[in-house]
Amino acid sequence: MTAEIKTGEKMIVFMVNGKEYAISVTQVKSIEKWQKPTRVPGVEPYICGVINLRGVVTPVIDLRKRLNLPEYEITDETRIIIIAYRDIEVGWIVDEANDVITVHESEIESAPEGVQKDTDVSIEQIVKQENRLLNIIDANAVLDKESSQSAVPDQA
């Protein structure tokens, strides 16, 4: 279930496959330029590998694959959004991330039934702002224990 959005909450807007998504800034640690992940064998297909981010081994998820969307080309606009998830950081590859908005309660609506029905990541809320419709995505809906930790070597 998507975390409750509060009036005045700031959200990062990012693009995946031509659609705008938003995530609370409270879930985002940083936004990084593209760097090619090192492959890790035996992980879920949507886990691209790991990157060394300021000395921290960080698993990277291809958000397009996680949302069952078509392949894409890496461009100068491609970004990795670093998400703080439980006690680790996880990167999401997105087409671009270039906007921060402030959301008000009156702009938030429940998503119509069946939104993102072809994936196990549900979109439960939508922000209607000016001429934009933004799917609110919650890190917990994308990252589960298995996917986020299966790319990280045992720390024991």
Swiss-Prot record:
Disruption phenotype: Chemotaxis is substantially impaired, with a 30-fold reduction in the efficiency of chemotaxis with aspartate and 11-fold reduction with 2-deoxyglucose. Inactivation of cheW appears to have a subtle effect on chemotactic behavior in the absence of chemoeffectors: the bacteria display a smooth swimming bias, with some tumbling. A double mutant lacking both CheV and CheW has a strong tumble bias, does not respond to addition of attractant, shows essentially no accumulation in capillary assays, and has greatly reduced methyl turnover on the methyl-accepting chemotaxis proteins (MCPs).
InterPro entries (alphabetical): CheW, CheW-like_dom_sf, CheW-lke_dom
Function comment: Involved in the transmission of sensory signals from the chemoreceptors to the flagellar motors. CheV and CheW are involved in the coupling of the methyl-accepting chemoreceptors to the central two-component kinase CheA; they are both necessary for efficient chemotaxis.
Gene Ontology CC terms: cytosol
Main localization, broad class: cytoplasm
Keyword DNA damage: no
Sorted UniProt keywords: Chemotaxis, Cytoplasm
Record organism: Bacillus subtilis (strain 168)
Any one Pfam family match given in the protein's UniProt record, by short name: CheW
Cellular localization per UniProt: Cytoplasm
GO BP: chemotaxis; chemotaxis to oxidizable substrate; signal transduction
Record-annotated CheW-like domain positions: 8-148
Protein name, entry field: Chemotaxis protein CheW
Top-rank taxon: Bacteria
